[in-house]
Amino acid sequence: MTAAAAEAPRWLTPAELADWRPLGGLLLKLPAALDTQMQRDSGLSHFEYLVLASLSEAPGRTRRMSALATLASGSLSRLSHVVKRLEGKGWITRQACQEDGRYTNAVLTDAGWEKVVASAPGHVEAVRSLILDALTEGELAQLGDIARRILTRLDSTGDVRAAFPAAVSTP
């Protein structure tokens, strides 16, 4: 028997459990609420919006598919299916990477840019009404600090902006 197997599990204390349960509920319900808003207002899934928004912030509105999958926290296979749907709507095109032909780039079209610009206000309002309006300025700063600390454990880059782009005003 290994030392790790001999150690007792680190069960949650009642206080930890009392804080974990609402956080777990938030982690389940918030994505669904954001997805519902995006579907209702823009006809996009939240994942599709994140893909379009990420491209809207990239230099030349272009990213490698592999980098886009990482940024959107999805598999390359899932991203490929989403990009195919977005291509069908004329919002994205795929092009061979000029720097390295082994890669494929996703490029946001002008119509895709217009879709992001049209979709962003509803998304921002949902973020405000569901999260920001419920917190004081100090609580929001504290939540941001906590989220960055946890995100760094999940993704060593800690790149929050890449994970949730375009929650700011568009030019």
PLM segments and residue spans:
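C-terminal regulatory/oligomerization modules of transcriptional regulators
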Residues: 1-14, 137-171
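N-terminal leader segment of winged-helix/HTH proteins
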Residues: 1-42, 89-91, 170-171
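Charged, amphipathic alpha-helical coiled-coil/dimerization segments
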Residues: 2-8, 84-142
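Hydrophobic alpha-helical core bundles mediating ligand binding, dimerization, or RNAP-core interactions
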Residues: 16, 20-38, 52, 116-135, ...
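N-terminal helix-turn-helix DNA-binding core of bacterial DNA-binding proteins
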Residues: 32-75, 162
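Short, hydrophobic-biased segments on the C-terminal half of alpha helices
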Residues: 65, 83-84
